[in-house]
Amino acid sequence: MYIGIRTRQEVEVQALTMASHVASLRGWHTALARAEIASLLPMAVVKRLPARRLIQLEGEISPEHMLEAVNCSSGCQALLSHAVLWSTEQPIDSLLKQMSDYIQTHTRTGSVAVRSWKHEGKMEGVSARDLMRKIGGMLSSHGYKIDLEQPEHRLGMVLDAKAGIVACGWMIGTGDDSDGISARRATDRPFFKPVSLDPRLARLAVNLASGPLQKGVTLDLMTGTGGFILEAAVSGREAYGIDLDSEMIEGAQKNLDWAAPVTTASLLLGDATRLLDVLPSDIIHRISGFVLDPPYGRNSQGTLEPTALIRAVLESCYSVAATDAHFVLIVPIHPFGEHAEEALPEDATVELLHGQWSELEACFEQTGWRLLERWVEHVHASLGRLILHAVIVPRD
């Protein structure tokens, strides 16, 4: 049994009114992106909008927290502060009136520009260029200096053609579909193995497990080539990576030096099933995020079969975890098809490549962890990945 996160990710369609904030998501796996931003901004209530790549964030969120979240996020391309939401069912003049009021209410100091981008193709009957020109004119009439090259502030506008929604607000983030993470793809690293994770998924898993940057330590349990710890280090997290194979530790260190030459991240030679014997004493019970992508083709734990290995790791993690720790596990599965818009329902049946789902589920329940959500990533015609998110359950 696992528990879906319903308190922060409500699935009902929200009325299109003045939102607290709107997050614009990249399109590669929107279900995971929603969960990631909820983890990075735990003070926010995340609500669904009719557009698959737009979500509403309610609550008191500081600009500093929003900037930190979008800068380290894998799945969020921008946040629009105190955004205006408009539907094509309304007259276009109502959007312009709302934006006029918005510009007067939400002031900025310094030069500005208007930036627009599209989701799901071209929006019929709405010209992004015309809207940008009119909103830019409003800014100019209120005394703002327009600087298209290096503005100090950007007013973002995203047009979602499929949902018929326009969201506008002062931007935090770039609005780009490209996140820059692909520059660290596995094949470009000094040390490479074919089984290495896509850095987008590695970054997202780290954020999902660890939460806000200052929450605690991130632990990459079987680091291999260092995919998780690289993304944690580049984000500025306090992070440790462990592996029993000295070749992997040496190779991961080369990758770490290449990706993040100035970092506090550290690699340790040791056994993830015996963490109390491996970790520095000052991080015990400060570890808030555990990430694990077990090396099935290279069983570094001797004769343990996959499910027994995961159980032993979960037990070891429980003994060193913070009281609010989270755990993200990625395991290979038989093809499940595309399923990028929603978390898996509780009754969905998945076939693991190694072991049985019922046994893996029991591993979490019996070692002090509660499964929250699970997602599937399509890899190719003969392989998928199951991403599991769990939270620690304090023992009596």
Task: Report residues per predicted region.
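Basic, glycine-rich polyanion-binding accessory segments appended to enzymes
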Residues: V114-W117
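Phosphate-coordination loops involved in phosphoryl transfer and adenosine-cofactor binding
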Residues: R108-S111, K215
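A broadly used, surface-exposed interaction patch
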Residues: H65-I103
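Class I S-adenosyl-L-methionine-dependent methyltransferase catalytic core
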Residues: Y2-S74, A78, H119-V126, D130, ...
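N-terminal cationic-hydrophobic initiation segments that often serve targeting/anchoring roles
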Residues: I103-Q104, Y318
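Short acidic low-complexity segments
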Residues: K145-P151
